[in-house]
């Protein structure tokens, strides 16, 4: 059991039951999955870029990502239907908690001029989305071996019914929200 899983069971669940008045511990919001997505627009012209993006995401997530393909042809972007244009991976259970722990305690403090994450990134249904502009903030990525700086999208899916419940859940995990 990871550190954040243990913290969730021993500290977060009782705190959220006390705050929101849940009658059952199973009604307390929990993390379902974390989805990492990296769109690589240059992959249409250079296939090596996509291979490097897949390798970076595999190092960051600890599992092999799937390559996403374009759904439609867009002439202005010079892509066709079915061409590989990015990669994504979904983390669940212990890998999810390990990634969240590294994100909160190691990666986000390494971001330049970091003053916290804006709390308006919730979607209205208890899920949280954020972006990271540089993949080099993760300790698994060697800065000297990176061919290009690429960002990624991080989507945290919870069982919370409202944004207030989801924010309380992430606050309990010491998520660095801006005041």
From Swiss-Prot:
Keywords: Ribonucleoprotein, Ribosomal protein, RNA-binding, rRNA-binding, tRNA-binding. It holds the Pfam family Ribosomal_L5. One of its GO terms (biological process) is translation. Gene3D superfamilies: 3.30.1440.10. One of its GO terms (cellular component) is ribosome. Part of the 50S ribosomal subunit; part of the 5S rRNA/L5/L18/L25 subcomplex. Contacts the 5S rRNA and the P site tRNA. Forms a bridge to the 30S subunit in the 70S ribosome. Belongs to the universal ribosomal protein uL5 family. This is one of the proteins that bind and probably mediate the attachment of the 5S RNA into the large ribosomal subunit, where it forms part of the central protuberance. In the 70S ribosome it contacts protein S13 of the 30S subunit (bridge B1b), connecting the 2 subunits; this bridge is implicated in subunit movement. Contacts the P site tRNA; the 5S rRNA and some of its associated proteins might help stabilize positioning of ribosome-bound tRNAs. This is Large ribosomal subunit protein uL5. The lineage of its organism: Bacteria, Pseudomonadati, Pseudomonadota, Gammaproteobacteria, Lysobacterales.
